[in-house]
């Protein structure tokens, strides 16, 4: 075997390790080029050819561009790609959370239900949402997010509007089931869609703004609801009925526009679901997009954006046990936030606040969340630290939960409100976890399935949260708060344990790799059937 070949493979190993262990800056792809070696570039070219990768014609290992050109391009992508994804996600959250505002207007009483019936409806929604996550994501991978996502938005908007006609418990549960079915898969669809355009570090940071839509539109939703609900009595309709109708039609307009505004991919930005037109980017910009993405993660070209994921590949991803610590945190990390967020209006009503105040008083907590969410992501990015930054959320929540448990039931309602607001305003690190899963997946297949499985784990947490406060525990939910305290302590320990787990996995791989001779290392790189994060030359970021 030639010296050149040996040098190439050893360099490849080093480059893969470096790329896996560090969070790159937005412009690092300019200086870091894993395709500098001709043999490695040709190996990857063959991978891209066999996969039918749509960006192959733009792949150029020798292509160069300036930092200013890349920064300008990223800003343009933010405006033309990310902004609309943000808007679509905002309306997902507006529609799926408007039920929490509807209950402040006697929704439960009007349908002759109780808290447990409401819990059941929320649980059904979340279970169906969870079950639809992976199928929805696989449909998007097969037919394209620019087609599937707009259809989802239109369907959930129609269902939202029909909720204005609800009369009883059975109809309520049926519409929650339908809503969960059409909304499932939307979030991992969009994460995968954004991964076509952004590097790993860029994606994680932008996902923090992606999830800023939650507090931002909860604030807007609360303001909107406080006004709409005052329409109760007009044409003999309840305020919550007007809420579903108005917000449903607003969402419907976004769904229709999405058919025209979502694009097929970086080299196909002239193609939407309904037409082919002028590309959003120049040929030169498309070439930068393709090469910067592949240099950040060469595996992003190992599947085309229409290539389906097989059942065998799904099972393979399920055996990627190194993703499981992140899935576990996806389940438990935000149960406190999800519980308090779902029940805040009911809790405030039970504390004798008016319907109007119950909606308005939700705003400070959401505003605090809106501030803390990007700050947590920025801290993670600056420190190049994921595990411990994820743990910050529950360190923040701990004193508020302890106080809720310790204070007597006759404590001033305003003090309880402040504690609940503190929980709602936690540094929401969901974006760090979601981006982390995408970043360490190390293949399009694992990324497609892994992001869906992570979001499914988050829905399991939401199911737990929707049943945390029970009818026999109100109005103070003392038992529920004690359970939340237990979850909070577990989450802090889990964040630290995850870091040590990945450190130990990297040390194990180092020992295995360093025990090989150079010839054995070269042979491994040429012949191994290990994929993704199971490869010995792959290192975990933590």
UniProtKB/Swiss-Prot annotation:
Descriptive protein name: Uncharacterized transporter YIL166C
GO molecular function: organic acid transmembrane transporter activity; organic anion transmembrane transporter activity; sulfate transmembrane transporter activity; sulfur compound transmembrane transporter activity; transmembrane transporter activity
Membrane disposition: Multi-pass membrane protein
Keywords annotated in UniProt: Membrane, Transmembrane, Transmembrane helix, Transport
Family annotation (InterPro entries): MFS, MFS_dom, MFS_trans_sf
Compartments in which it is found: Membrane
CDD domains xref list: MFS_FEN2_like
Superkingdom of origin: Eukaryota
GO aspect biological process, one term: sulfur compound transport
Signal peptide: none
A Pfam family matched in the record: MFS_1
PROSITE patterns per the UniProt record, alphabetical: MFS
Cytoplasmic side: 100-119, 169-176, 230-241, 348-359, 409-416, 504-542
Organism name: Saccharomyces cerevisiae (strain ATCC 204508 / S288c)
One cellular component term from this protein's GO annotations in UniProt: fungal-type vacuole
UniProt similarity note: Belongs to the major facilitator superfamily. Allantoate permease family.
PANTHER family registered for this protein in UniProt: MAJOR FACILITATOR SUPERFAMILY (MFS) PROFILE DOMAIN-CONTAINING PROTEIN-RELATED, PERMEASE-RELATED
Residue ranges annotated as Extracellular topological domain: 1-78, 141-147, 198-208, 263-326, 381-387, 438-482
